[in-house]
Regions:
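N-terminal Rossmann-like NAD(P)+-binding subdomain of aldehyde/semialdehyde dehydrogenases
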Residues: 11-58
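Glycine-rich anion-binding loops and their surrounding alpha/beta cores
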Residues: 62, 84, 99, 122-128, ...
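Short beta-strand segments at enzyme active-site cores
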Residues: 32-33, 103-105, 212-213
């Protein structure tokens, strides 16, 4: 029941799944969805809620089988307030250029000037859900781009509301978790340490080989300005730029 939702400390997995399904089916109006988003500005999302939201989005996705490529997705939550360029998107081209297969899942920016889809669109990429075109892109360029609203009705439905609110929401957390390809590998950047651990818990049971990163000065990626945490299956480690052979810099 969405009406009692704001007064609860958390909901269980099944309730969270039902809420996302109802959004996709148009059972809530824009004001109700905006209120739901606002709840998570006032309290943290639980592991069960995140898992339920994720399950609902994956159940309703348009599935895409590119498993033969054993691809990686490199993605950040955004919402770190740092006004950087699209570092994870640029990284995808570097990795693909090195010969590794990348399946990038992204959207238009909700809290920033430019999301991954804005960048891709400006560079002439034509968004498609055609599996044959995506496969040809992987074969010829080692990269395929999946514009999120084409593959999930919920993400399409909430996009205008997220943009009008202009604040970081739990959909920032969900986007990186619901790549419809279910890639073999994921490198995920998050905007705070609690979310790093939340992602890590979520992925422990998934079979995905993952790493979640957060720079301690607030970036949702590895930076050269501070130490950064990396969470991987069964371990979490603190790194410095110097450990990777880089000089530290100031913002």
């Amino acid at each position: 029941d969405l009406h009692s939702f704001p007064t609860r400390r958390s909901s269980d997995l099944d309730e969270a799944r039902t809420i996302l399904q109802n959004i996709a089916e148009g059972k809530y109006n824009d004001s109700q969805i905006a209120s739901l988003i606002t709840v998570y500005l006032m309290r943290n999302i639980s592991v069960e809620e995140l898992a339920g939201f994720r399950e609902a989005l994956l159940e309703m996705r348009v599935p895409v089988d590119l498993s033969e490529f054993k691809p990686i997705d490199i993605v950040g939550t955004g919402g770190d307030g740092k006004n950087t360029f699209n570092i994870s998107t640029a990284s995808c081209f570097v990795v693909a250029g090195a010969g590794y297969n990348v399946v990038k899942h992204g959207n238009y920016g909700a809290t920033s000037v430019s999301g991954a889809s804005n960048v891709m669109e400006q560079h002439g990429v034509k968004f498609t859900a055609d599996i044959d075109r995506l496969r040809r892109s992987m074969e010829s360029c080692h990269i395929a781009y999946l514009h999120a609203p084409l593959f999930n009705p919920t993400l399409k439905a909430v996009a205008p509301i997220r943009k009008s609110l202009g604040v970081r929401s739990f959909f920032n957390m969900l986007g990186p978790l619901v790549n419809p390809v279910m890639p073999t590998y994921q490198l995920l950047g998050v905007y705070n340490l609690p979310l790093l651990r939340l992602y890590s818990y979520t992925y422990q049971e998934s079979g995905t080989r993952f790493a979640v990163v957060h720079s301690l000065d607030g970036y949702d990626e590895i930076s050269l300005t501070a130490e950064f945490k990396v969470a991987m299956p069964e371990k979490e480690k603190l790194y410095t730029p110097e450990m990777l052979g880089f000089s530290r810099t100031t913002e």
